[in-house]
Amino acid sequence: MLRRFPTRTTAPGQGGARRSRVRALAWLLASGAMTHLSPALADVPYVLVKTNMVVTSVAMKPYEVTPTRMLVCGIAAKLGAAASSPDAHVPFCFGKDLKRPGSSPMEVMLRAVFMQQRPLRMFLGPKQLTFEGKPALELIRMVECSGKQDCP
């Protein structure tokens, strides 16, 4: 089950988002979900829990060939892998046709980036992502509960 953290509605300069991020990351470490977290990852918008992969960058850009399509690209990094290892960094991209209904981009990303397409638990920091009008936390919950009978 995902643990939600309250987010403050303070101005960017007041440090509310940073306090929330630090509190959330401290919970991750204390819970044993992650044994090592690089200081560089403190500003990453989300961290995967119970896997050895973290998404280190994500960007959205228009697909030049078709203007009604967006591309979401990023890099997932394997914790503990040598930087020279071929599987240390996994680049990924997926597209979404803005005119057609279908799987959410977040669900596509979660299933495309990580091998074996197993359900994932994920922590989202104060930078809330929204895809197709749905908060990312709800999309993550949908992916996590995929195929389980104990999910609402």
Curated annotation (Swiss-Prot):
The protein's location, in the record's own words, is:
Secreted; Host cell membrane
Q: Does the keyword Cell wall biogenesis/degradation apply?
A: no
Endpoints of the signal sequence: 1-42
Entry's Gene Ontology cellular component terms = extracellular region; host cell plasma membrane; membrane
Superkingdom of the organism of origin? Bacteria
The record's Gene3D superfamilies line, in alphabetical order, gives: 2.40.50.110
Q: Which GO terms describe its molecular function?
A: toxin activity
Disulfide bond entries: 73-93, 145-151
Q: Which UniProt keywords apply?
A: Disulfide bond, Host cell membrane, Host membrane, Membrane, Secreted, Signal, Toxin, Virulence, Whooping cough
* Record flagged with keyword Signal: yes
What does this gene product do? PTX oligomer B binds to receptors on the eukaryotic cell surface and facilitates the translocation of the toxic subunit across the cell membrane.
Task: Describe the protein's quaternary organization and the partners it interacts with.
Answer: Pertussis toxin contains five different chains, S1-S5. They are organized into 2 functional subunits: A, composed of S1 (which is toxic) and B, containing S2, S3, S5, and two copies of S4 (B binds to the membrane receptors). Dimers of S2-S4 and S3-S4 are held together by S5.
Name this protein carries in UniProt: Pertussis toxin subunit 4
State which gene encodes it. Answer: ptxD
